[in-house]
Amino acid sequence: MAEMTESKNFIHAFIDEDIAPGGQFAGQTVHTRFPPEPNGYLHIGHCKALIIDFGTAEKYNGLCNLRMDDTNPTKEDVEFVEAIKEDIHWLGFDWGDRFYYGSDYFEKDYEYAVELIKKGLAYVCELTPEQFKEYRGDLNTPAVSPYRDRPIEESLDLFARMRAGEFEDNRYTLRAKIDLASGNFNMRDPVIYRIRHMHHHRQGDKWCIYPMYDFAHPIQDALEGITHSLCSLEFENHRPLYNWVVEHVSVPHHPRQIEFARLGIDHTVLSKRKLRALVENGYVSGWDDPRMPTLCGLRRRGYTPKSIRNFCERVGVAKSPNTIPYAFLEFCLREDLNETAQRVMAVLKPVKLTITNYPEGKSEMVTVENNPNRPEDGTREVSFSRHLWIEQDDFLAEPIPKYKRLYPNGPECRLKGAYLITCTGCVKDDSVNVVEILATYDPESRGGDPADGRKVKGATIHWVDAENCCDAEVRQYDNLFNDPDPDAAGKDFLACLNEKSLEVLTGCKVEASLRDAKAPASYQFMRLGYFCPDSKDCAPGHLVFNRSVSLKDSFKPGK
């Protein structure tokens, strides 16, 4: 596991060399790009790449383009395009006027393919997909193509007819002529164009041939003036092909490709295919389910842009794959919310507390601080009366050793911001369930401090005024998967699902100040955790809160 502290970014070291006097890009503006495929929602894994691309541009006062990689006609959707834009803006990044689609370059891709054919560096091949595998060879045997020496004019004619739609899918491909004996199979005359009679979400039916990613991507980078094409580690073996393309067609720029390890997180899956299966089979409520690792899911759960950026930056940039504990992501959120979230009182599993010596019908306002870490956030007034709600866990009819909360004839306890109380007994129903707790209060202890300065031996507990509060539904989330590595080879990831990843509590009580709560606000429910109003379901008169993260955890960075 990577050490979760700020680490040296080897990408920046490469860039420093490139822009230094005599370097490849000396005197040039550092220019990166983020090229998501619009066939799904961005997740926390994409977020690392996004922050590397945009963050690198920020560091060097450079530019970062947003380019939708929509060269594959079968997967793209406008819904995903808009969602990706929203997520990037939410994280605090902007691409200015540099928003592009890969499909915008189809005509240029075609022209460069023709250029390669004319140079004798590409040819039309008739091998079927099955034959292609058969002729591919192995480490000791070169690949073979009986069409490699097809005359240039014949390849030009066939390629033009491929574009005109004369042939069915897979009848022909266009292959780069590189090295059939290369130890890197990506260089064994790779396919750079294929026939696909598919409707494209932006180009319509204009095209029936589509460039392969390994051909289109370096051309797009070069045409946009990208200096550093930053991508994940699986493209390391594709770098020779990337370089070959930009060196053999007449593009105006020659970008440098640099690879970094993808972000892996335990207790989750980041495969779009598997995430889609969770959605389509009803294991989660949608792409924005707060248990999902998608940015829209994390946002709905209450994650902040700062916490996610901080997480990605502290994980660092690695050259080899690593898996980061999900608990570290939670740590970063907890760290942020501890500083910024307003403290409020909420009771999730309520039981009534009656202060028997407090006047019936009386109500008063007590002062509670909004955030002890931020005095500038001030205080608020909270109503207090004879009848309160407290947590069931804050009372035991028969106490256990070292229990310091309420029990009959136990020690004084402090009601947060209000008074000291002493439990005198309880009321039970016919099933021997406690339905009401009885206590007396010290009228001279307003604010929680006794007038005589005596030591309070009991705990401080939170409460909600039963005469002035709101009902709420609270959703508490846990890891979506019990298994820390549900994505491992040979595992059925669905069999690893945590059946207790969602607990819905109804009949919760929250203080009246939350009556109009709405996303994206975040709150610390005192002693319980950090919560946020659900962005879809929370509304005045129907309050719904999601637990963003627990109040404490044993996880510490670097462990």
Predicted features along the sequence, with ranges:
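Conserved short loop/turn motifs at secondary-structure junctions
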Residues: 36-38, 67-75, 97-107, 130, ...
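A glycine-rich helix N-cap at a beta->alpha junction
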Residues: 80-107, 112-113, 120-123
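Active-site cores that bind ATP or allylic diphosphates and position pyrophosphate for catalysis
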Residues: 66, 70-72, 115-275, 329, ...
